[in-house]
Amino acid sequence: MLSPRKTKFRKHHRGRMKGISTRGNSIVFGKFALQALEPSWITSRQIEAGRRSMTRYARRGGKIWIRIFPDKPVTMRPAETRMGSGKGSPEYWVAVVKPGRILYEMDGVPENIARAAMKIAAYKMPNKTQFLIRDNKDLIDSKI
């Protein structure tokens, strides 16, 4: 699973997910993409589950790019612990995803295989997504 090697601070504030994604919202590497339509935190386990399902469906053909990285630690306190005595320890990592962000890209496979593989990966995501196709300079989209 994905996680940073080294961070400046061990614990982060939770923060708010306001607005839409201004970066990482266009297809750069592949021909097909999965785009987020809602804001959410996507865990490293969910990212890995989506990647595995896509690679298994596409078999040997094609290349997959993961366009998000979990760089925010989420802390949890132990069960049945009294209030106070500081913040909990980091348990897992999440990627903060805003609407419009490209999650995965794919190339080297036919459209029907890419669409089916992305649909399987979309089931593993906590937010609504849509399938995008890069057609020269035009983008053709369809909601999954």
From Swiss-Prot:
Pfam families for the chain: Ribosomal_L16
GO biological process: mitochondrial translation
Alphabetized InterPro entries for the sequence: Ribosomal_uL16, Ribosomal_uL16_bact-type, Ribosomal_uL16_CS, Ribosomal_uL16_dom, Ribosomal_uL16_sf
Keywords, in A-Z order: Chloroplast, Plastid, Ribonucleoprotein, Ribosomal protein
GO annotations of cellular component type: chloroplast; mitochondrial large ribosomal subunit
Subcellular location: Plastid, Chloroplast
GO terms of molecular function: rRNA binding; structural constituent of ribosome
CDD domains named in the record: Ribosomal_L16_L10e
Broad class of where this protein is predominantly found: plastid
Subunit annotation: Part of the 50S ribosomal subunit.
Protein family: Belongs to the universal ribosomal protein uL16 family.
UniProt xrefs under NCBIfam families: rplP_bact
PANTHER family: 50S/60S RIBOSOMAL PROTEIN L16, LARGE RIBOSOMAL SUBUNIT PROTEIN UL16M
Protein name: Large ribosomal subunit protein uL16c
Organism: Chara vulgaris
